[in-house]
Amino acid sequence: VLSSADKTNIKAAWDKVGGNAGEYGAEALERMFLSFPTTKTYFPHFDLSHGSAQVKGHGKKVGDALTNAVGHLDDLPGALSALSDLHAYKLRVDPVNFKLLSHCLLVTLANHLPSDFTPAVHASLDKFLASVSTVLTSKYR
């Protein structure tokens, strides 16, 4: 459960992300593909090379989804319902991959926002991404 302090930290951090959400999403995906090569199996039709248009496009989708989630911290299940359906029923993504991408997102954010990435902000963002992952995998059961 996100506390009011967590919500404040998440919104403040995401304000710093600003218009870079798609870029950071793509960077996190690329980091995930390099660090956890098995995740590439879900993207057999993608050009996974550095800076590819397909990775950038999917990164924008990730960034947009997270921006939407930040705007709906009090109703993540409602905000992410369609995305949860897509990943559970159509794409059938292994739930562990959400944890891997979350880790890569945290590394990416820490890299780009070092002075803002305090231990408290790190903890809040980690809880947020864990909550998003929980919602995205909730329909697997």
Swiss-Prot record:
Residue ranges occupied by any Globin domain in the UniProt entry: 1-141
Q: Which SUPFAM superfamilies match?
A: Globin-like
Q: Where does heme b bind?
A: H87
Residues that bear N6-succinyllysine: K7, K11, K16, K40
Q: Which InterPro entries match?
A: Globin, Globin-like_sf, Globin/Proto, Hemoglobin_a-typ, Hemoglobin_oxygen_transport, Hemoglobin_pi
Q: At what positions is Phosphothreonine found?
A: T8, T108, T134, T137
Where Phosphotyrosine occurs along the chain?
Y24
**Phosphoserine: which positions carry it?**
S3, S35, S49, S102, S124, S131, S138
Q: What is this protein called?
A: Hemoglobin subunit alpha
Lineage, broadest ranks: Eukaryota, Metazoa, Chordata, Craniata, Vertebrata
